[in-house]
Regions:
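Catalytic-domain carbohydrate-binding cleft regions of carbohydrate-active enzymes
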Residues: 1-238
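Accessory, solvent-exposed terminal regions and/or long lumenal/extracellular loops of proteins
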Residues: 238-340, 344
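A short, sequence-level motif marking secondary-structure junctions
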Residues: 230, 344-345
């Protein structure tokens, strides 16, 4: 498939596969965890599955958000709990009436996977298919994923250069014993620590924040020292997200799809340490990047002077047809609020 596509097409090839072997990642392949069941325990298993798979050198992975198999009381009538050998931690059987909660939690997890895709045998599978409350939450995370595309696409560039996955187990960044045992948290690039909710009815969960860094609650701006367990709030619309202090996160403007280029990019800086981030851009469609047709921009934060520069130049600037950093948002973790530093356009 890859050879034929390269020979005949100018645009990039993407292959979705569930069969993997060493070296398959060089053929534009993303993998998924097969036709999984819509169960809470199955959602829980997706996290270690993803981390082990990505650690093997296959950086692009996904799952069928919400599960692929039909619900037992809708299409098939099959009782498939027996196939899971009674491993569900809550014993709650997912049915049509309570499925929306599982779908929301799976969707939140999927928004921080290398490949974000929803799929299944359900007749309706749009964000508005599960009620108004669910729609509002799903749209929130869909917009969040799109806003992070400058960050995510730049991570993909680093993966191409180094082979290191950007969805990775905590021990890859923090080689400590506590992190080596964790299977339900992960890093999404150098900045984000993600702690998905995988229990029915759960509104808070324990989260370990690794030592060697300070951490900031993405939703509240609250600052935490590393090397400790905390009890994080996890209401239905909230997946616990923590940002490593000393991070730069490029954020794109709202778009309905990636067919629309994000021409306005702002920087969100989480102070606490000197840091840098390489922003990457190409045409997003062809293989011209293999010929060197791409651009990078080195963003650097000096924590002492509280100054952000790009390739050593003060912001804002025009780069690759984009207006970069007309606004720099520095997260004030001491006062638990955001401080907007607006540069002169």
């Amino acid at each position: 498939i890859w050879n034929g596509h390269r020979a005949r097409c100018r645009h990039r090839c993407l292959i979705l596969s569930r069969a993997a072997y060493l070296g398959a990642q060089k053929y534009g392949t993303t993998f998924w965890s097969s036709d999984v069941y819509p169960e809470w325990d199955v959602l829980k298993r997706q996290i270690p599955t993803a981390l082990n798979f990505c650690a093997s050198g296959m950086p692009y992975w996904s799952s069928d958000i919400g599960g692929w198999q039909p619900l037992p009381d809708t299409e098939s009538g099959e009782d498939y709990n027996s196939l899971l050998i009674g491993t569900s931690s809550t014993g709650t059987q997912v049915k049509k009436q309570n499925y929306a909660e599982l779908y929301i939690r799976w969707f939140q997890f999927g928004a921080f996977c290398p490949t974000f895709r929803t799929h299944g045998t359900r007749k309706h599978n749009e964000v508005w298919s599960y009620g108004e409350k669910a729609e509002q939450i799903l749209v929130k995370y869909l917009k969040l994923r799109y806003s992070l595309m400058p960050y995510i696409y730049s991570l993909a560039y680093q993966t191409t250069r180094t082979g290191a996955p950007f969805m990775r187990a905590l021990w890859m960044d923090f080689p400590e014993e506590e992190c080596a045992r964790l299977q339900d948290e992960f890093m999404f690039g150098p900045a984000f620590l993600i702690a998905p909710v995988v229990e029915c009815g759960q509104t808070q969960r324990r989260v370990y924040l690794p030592q060697g860094a300070d951490w900031v609650d993405y939703w509240t701006g609250r600052h935490y020292r590393g090397g400790r367990w905390i009890l994080a709030q996890a209401q239905m619309d909230c997946i616990p997200i923590f940002v490593r202090a000393g991070s730069i996160i490029p954020v794109g403007e709202d778009v309905e799809s990636l067919q629309t280029e994000q021409k306005q990019i702002e920087a969100r800086v989480y102070p606490g340490a000197d840091c840098s981030f390489t922003l990457y851009s190409d045409d997003g469609k062809t293989y011209d990047y293999e010929k060197g047709v791409y651009d990078t921009l080195e963003l650097r934060w000096d924590d002492c002077s509280k100054r952000l520069t790009a390739n050593g130049t003060a912001l804002p600037l025009e780069w690759c047809g984009k207006t970069i950093m007309t606004k720099v948002v520095v997260i004030d973790t001491e006062n638990k609020e955001n401080t907007e530093c607006v540069t002169d356009a």
